[in-house]
């Protein structure tokens, strides 16, 4: 099962230094003047320089077939930067570029190709710095401090466009129809692709392509574009441009998982942890007015308050949603954490998950069957673990080289401070008692007697997310736990990576000379106080997993130094993000869903009420991408995730799955 892996480009460089595909026997760009051809065919062909100053929305969306070396994207980014410098007061402030690539270049080849265009170096270097691994699905790159978003979809465009969420329909303002020539790559240039382009095109959207092949022109016309021939670039006689003049009604393919956003960009976030902080930052970058209400006197007093938390993905070969979501979330988290202009304690030292017994080794074997790139997950034997971690474990495992640890409390506080400098309003000591929807707004009442009114509300308050009448039926549950803080020893200070077993142990934090070891697990428990039994249990689990390891016996928990917290989890180990579903209306509207899928109504939700929760023990890995997904949804922008995986993150998923099978929810 290797659904995540894609084949990198198989190329060589010709005498002119131009990359040539060995598989398609075609150049990636013109030997003569690829840069000028891109400007002529795609920028002028779509009239972008004239359209940018008049664009009525804050974001312009371009979609492309065939990313290749990124020449089209870099050229457009350069032009967009010039537009912003010339028109700083224009409505258009952000560029969103969506590109599909079946055979992505490896980073080394990308860098070599970019040497052709020194005038694009300042943009190319930023792309190279975030260039993703060859994993299938969507890689979101946030560039130029979020002003430019690049969604790289790795895989076959004809398959990927079928997997896009309905929320992407009619979002594209301009199409760059590129790729290897139709004669060299006929599979891509299909009626299927042309229909997908039409579905994604906003009414009034344009397209341009270098080819003038008759079947391409006819196929695009049949899909709904008005097409015309134009003079081609240089020695090419003709090319094609087109306009989507129609406004087609597009029925939802899975209305029970429909996602909706808002026109009014004002919201309140309830919470105070890492999810709240990152969501606030993502919304502010999109021009939202955001107010954060935190029940505690300071940020990160809940599950995000630990001194050290491990960053690594949850892997499973048994659940496609998990195997698609977590590698994407993990790689996005690393890109975001490295790019954030904040300071916090962290060390990307790697994480090693150990197969200390037969059952845990079987679990690791099925993780490795995913065939992920070694930069994400790689098998390691006992000697390699000793070499990598500094401590003997007498067992094999799986290593996450890009993982490590960070201080969630410091990161959360730093991101909130950064968001405040961008306009975030924060109120501490505001515990939300109730919220009610009246006359188009949400009325909030807090336990300190204060009231507030907001256009929309996001619940991101950990295990308290189900405290309200609108959310009390959500299938989530609290998990209390205790993390022990232990002093280092001559043996423990050798530990260079995070160790995960039937618990976890971090390398020492140089700021305090302590390690974190944890964590106990008490399902259903919301009131957590220091427990000596939990303290001893954290130590004993380590000793039990490695009975021959003398270093494990050195762990000293006698200081009674620990931190308690409560996580929020789900039965299927996936978080929940999106509109808050209306439970009673869902049961009423979908009581016969199994027989009436063709006539099903859009998912019943509370208008303007959203949630980001149930992150379990993987919030450091998942919060960045979940915040980006929700900010995109709320802003009615393209969402960086396929529809099947998004369905696996939908807050109503467990109810709908039963209803689709004709089973009772209650």
From Swiss-Prot:
Keywords: Cytoplasm, FAD, Flavoprotein, Methyltransferase, Multifunctional enzyme, Oxidoreductase, S-adenosyl-L-methionine, Transferase, tRNA processing. InterPro entries: FAD-dep_OxRdtase (IPR006076), FAD/NAD-bd_sf (IPR036188), MnmC-like_methylTransf (IPR008471), SAM-dependent_MTases_sf (IPR029063), tRNA_MAMT_biosynth_bifunc_MnmC (IPR023032), tRNA_MNMC2 (IPR047785), tRNA_S-uridine_synth_MnmC_C (IPR017610). The keyword Oxidoreductase applies. Its main location: cytoplasm. It catalyses: 5-aminomethyl-2-thiouridine(34) in tRNA + S-adenosyl-L-methionine = 5-methylaminomethyl-2-thiouridine(34) in tRNA + S-adenosyl-L-homocysteine + H(+). One of its GO terms (molecular function) is tRNA (5-methylaminomethyl-2-thiouridylate)(34)-methyltransferase activity. It comes from the Bacteria. It is found in: Cytoplasm. Residues 270-666 are annotated as: FAD-dependent cmnm(5)s(2)U34 oxidoreductase. Residues 1-245 are annotated as: tRNA (mnm(5)s(2)U34)-methyltransferase. Its cofactor is FAD. One of its GO terms (biological process) is methylation. Its EC number is 2.1.1.61, 1.5.-.-. Pfam families: DAO (PF01266), Methyltransf_30 (PF05430). GO terms for cellular component: cytoplasm. HAMAP family: MnmC. Catalyzes the last two steps in the biosynthesis of 5-methylaminomethyl-2-thiouridine (mnm(5)s(2)U) at the wobble position (U34) in tRNA. Catalyzes the FAD-dependent demodification of cmnm(5)s(2)U34 to nm(5)s(2)U34, followed by the transfer of a methyl group from S-adenosyl-L-methionine to nm(5)s(2)U34, to form mnm(5)s(2)U34. In the N-terminal section; belongs to the methyltransferase superfamily. tRNA (mnm(5)s(2)U34)-methyltransferase family. In the C-terminal section; belongs to the DAO family. This is tRNA 5-methylaminomethyl-2-thiouridine biosynthesis bifunctional protein MnmC. It comes from Enterobacter sp. (strain 638). The lineage of its organism: Bacteria, Pseudomonadati, Pseudomonadota, Gammaproteobacteria, Enterobacterales. The gene is mnmC.
